[in-house]
């Protein structure tokens, strides 16, 4: 089970959660940066991610589709702003590939990975919002519970990479 850790927002209008993931940082990184792995965990069940298109470099695509149990479909288009291998990712939906602005955007997200003191990976996920209303909307959508569930799924996906047959 992904163990909750206490983390505090580092900027105004930010929501953040932290977990210790019982898997090596490299495996957690792969789950964030490889489309087929991201699809396994990125949305809390019973929702799923049937499509993911990732070009993990500044300005590259971060496009996903979320599918709900009743046929709902949410397309999410964004870009990566920063990619520091096995350490940090920053992405936003304020732009699409090539830094083309799109609408008002919802958030800029970041992921920080580091080695946990007693093994595993320290995982921090933050979402920074343009407005107080946007942040409150994200809270009401279930930010903490949803990302807590996704962190459990992330841990499961990362652990699946530990099988010698699946390592590259």
Predicted regions and their residues:
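A short, structured loop/turn motif at beta-sheet edges
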Residues: 25-26, 56-57, 81-88, 112-122
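Beta-strand/loop substructures that line and gate deep hydrophobic ligand-binding cavities in soluble
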Residues: 92, 96-145
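A conserved amphipathic terminal alpha-helix motif
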Residues: 129-168
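Hydrophobic ligand-binding cavity/cleft-lining segments
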Residues: 1-48
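Hydrophobic pocket/interface hotspot
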Residues: 28, 38, 62, 80, ...
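Short beta-edge strand/loop motif at the mouth of beta-sheet-based domains
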Residues: 16, 36-75, 167-168
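Intrinsic-disorder/low-complexity, polar/charged segments enriched in Ser/Thr/Lys/Arg/Asp/Glu/Gln
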Residues: 12-18, 25, 61, 75, ...
């Amino acid at each position: 089970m992904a163990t909750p850790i206490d983390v505090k927002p580092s900027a105004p209008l930010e929501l953040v959660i932290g977990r210790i993931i019982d898997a090596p940082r490299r495996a957690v990184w792969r789950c964030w940066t490889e489309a087929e792995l991201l699809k396994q965990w990125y949305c809390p069940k019973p929702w799923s991610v049937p499509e993911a298109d990732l070009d993990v470099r500044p300005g590259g695509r971060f496009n996903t589709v979320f599918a709900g149990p009743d046929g709902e479909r949410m397309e999410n288009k964004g870009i990566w702003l920063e990619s520091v291998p096995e350490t940090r990712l920053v992405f936003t939906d304020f732009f699409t590939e090539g830094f083309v602005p799109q609408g008002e955007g919802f958030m800029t997200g970041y992921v920080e990975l580091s080695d946990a003191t007693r093994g595993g990976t320290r995982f921090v996920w933050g979402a920074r919002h343009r407005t107080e209303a946007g942040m409150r909307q994200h809270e009401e959508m279930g930010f903490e519970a949803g990302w807590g569930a996704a962190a459990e799924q992330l841990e499961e996906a990362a652990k699946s990479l530990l099988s010698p047959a699946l390592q590259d």
